[in-house]
Amino acid sequence: MPRNSGAGYGCPHGDPSMLDSRETPQESRQDMTVGTTQEKLKTSSLTDRQPLSKESLNHALKLSVPEKVNNAQWDAPEEALWTTRADGRVRLRIDPSCPQLPYTVHRMFYEALDKYGDFSALGFKCQDKWEHISYSQYYLLARRAAKGFLKLGLERAHSVAILGFNSPEWFFSAVGTVFAGGIVTGIYTTSSPEACQYIAYDCCANVIMVDTQKQLEKILKVWKQLPHLKAVVIYKEPPPNKMANVYTMEEFMELGNEVPEEALDAIIDTQQPNQCCVLVYTSGTTGNPKGVMLSQDNITWTARYGSQAGDIRPAEVQQEVVVSYLPLSHIAAQIYDLWTGIQWGAQVCFAEPDALKGSLVNTLREVEPTSHMGVPRVWEKIMERIQEVAAQSGFIRRKMLLWAMSVTLEQNLTCPGSDLKPFTTRLADYLVLAKVRQALGFAKCQKNFYGAAPMTAETQHFFLGLNIRLYAGYGLSETSGPHFMSSPCNYRLYSSGKLVPGCRVKLVNQDTEGIGEICLWGRTIFMGYLNMEDKTCEAIDEEGWLHTGDAGRLDADGFLYITGRLKELIITAGGENVPPVPIEEAVKMELPIISNAMLIGTDQRKFLSMLLTLKCTLDPDTSDPTDNLTEQAVEFCQRVGSRATTVSEIVGKDEAVYQAIEEGIRRVNMNAAARPYHIQKWAILERDFSISGGELGPTMKLKRLTVLEKYKDIIDSFYREQKM
């Protein structure tokens, strides 16, 4: 985090006892509880010369003394199961098997403050050194931010929208929004000005937080169309010039000093667990984005029980260390990094904004997380990078890695639950694999999670070969994150784990193989879509069950297996229902040169076809795909007799590569369940899918409708030729 002069937060100049400045986050795990909280609260850990007084903490503690917290009763009138109003309330789905009383975000933070006040909460880089913020400092920064929002005119059940990369400011602004009675709303940093306008208008944003001038420019372009917007705060860079109602973070936090603590306390006292505190907007692939309303109970329940199901541990047992880098506007990252972090006293370290362009591995090495979450595409990129390095290694090192991964994969597939490893497996780990994990930053990582999209069998097998087991979670924005979780205790390859305690599932309209639509019920289920009653009624039935639109099956032990989206199910002209994902995965497994494969067959097409992209390197500055093939792709070409090193050398020209792909698809067809599942035509696209190209969403999930529209001419050509 670079120092900014007079704008936003730079490096602190306060008492060094307030904030540990060390080379690596690991050292900050030592001596976390030396001294009392009040002795350390002399200056802010992020602001220059801004005091966090003992009186402020004393006041906060008096507000939330254990007796007051434990005796507090939430107002639980007979409410409906859903609402579309930002100021509405809902009836909570409390299961007798897990009947914990609902509580608010403030109470969750207070309990963390009581147990973990002196533990490191947030870690960030400042002038190439890691700095740390304790939970006590974090709490008071959130309170000051809350008072700043009140001073700027934040109204009850209106939003503070945050448009910026993950940072301490994102975190304590989000918590401060909830404390102030507002609703925190994340906006993807890749959003256009028009997309920002839609979300800010829909959620009635009173304040928008931006991290850079680039993001500020987006808001300035649409401000006149945002009648509820009162102020913008920029927190990483100074504004280009002085503008009315545009504040630096330092100015914003100073505003909070003008609001009495009692004014904030009064708002906190009136908050109820069944009120909205978070809005998560869907990607909008099938229309305008929908605002998913999550209650305080959704957040506190999921942060506790969803994470417990994933074996996340409280800091008094072992402080979890995580790296925050995925977009916080997505529920998976927000619940995992922000809210679960508070629940269990985790240390959250922030990656650089260019994490997904290549710097993530450097942060992982420095931080050495104990648990880590990535969307499948992130894990695939790590896999491809390892494969590239291996291809460039000497013969002996490459053979050693292949041997070690082979014996380890075989052991993990044949005896997945066994702690007793054969000598050869232990030797392989000692000589080779432990060093690979250390180079990746996973030397201390005990839990590696993925979610938000399906993962290929190839990727799972690759990491099993490294002795890295990837645990799946299944959920949606509408389930506040995970409704099913895998963990070291509940793991089955290719499954999405078991139900989170207190949650329910049923499969409706099951076929002969037991596959049906997944319907969910429990404390994770969202309040409703903001201002969209028709969409809410489509999603939630009269008994309160959420219809996910996903198809899946349950095995005898309760493990869930996702088979695809019902909307993505391809219905051929012959009436066959074809789930695309298994076929796409089979093609990528058979052909290691393929980056993306998308099955085509919608609109009652007479046969299946497929669009393919090739694995290529990414531009280090933009993360856009280049024309250069990856080392793995070049190796594939050489194996089949091609000298190609770029995509353009292959598309429409390279007979050797085309023949190899044709043979691979023929092998996939031979293993298909029936002829209607065969891929009859295919094409290689000139450019890999990307976020900038529109084919991938912010979490790198495939946007099928966009692909169908963008490559309509190519797709139509498959079927025009059939008519001739």
Swiss-Prot record:
Residues 31-51 have a biased composition (Polar residues). It is an enzyme of class 6 (ligase). This is Long-chain-fatty-acid--CoA ligase ACSBG1. One of its GO terms (molecular function) is ATP binding. It catalyses: a long-chain fatty acid + ATP + CoA = a long-chain fatty acyl-CoA + AMP + diphosphate; (E)-hexadec-2-enoate + ATP + CoA = (2E)-hexadecenoyl-CoA + AMP + diphosphate; hexadecanoate + ATP + CoA = hexadecanoyl-CoA + AMP + diphosphate. It is found in: Cytoplasm; Cytoplasmic vesicle; Microsome; Endoplasmic reticulum. The modification Phosphoserine is found at S53, S56. Residues 20-30 have a biased composition (Basic and acidic residues). CDD domains: ACSBG_like. Its EC number is 6.2.1.3. InterPro entries: AMP-binding_CS, AMP-dep_synth/lig_dom, ANL_N_sf. Catalyzes the conversion of fatty acids such as long-chain and very long-chain fatty acids to their active form acyl-CoAs for both synthesis of cellular lipids, and degradation via beta-oxidation. Can activate diverse saturated, monosaturated and polyunsaturated fatty acids. Belongs to the ATP-dependent AMP-binding enzyme family. Bubblegum subfamily. The keyword ATP-binding applies. Residues 1-51 are annotated as: Disordered. The gene is ACSBG1. Pfam families: AMP-binding, AMP-binding_C_3.
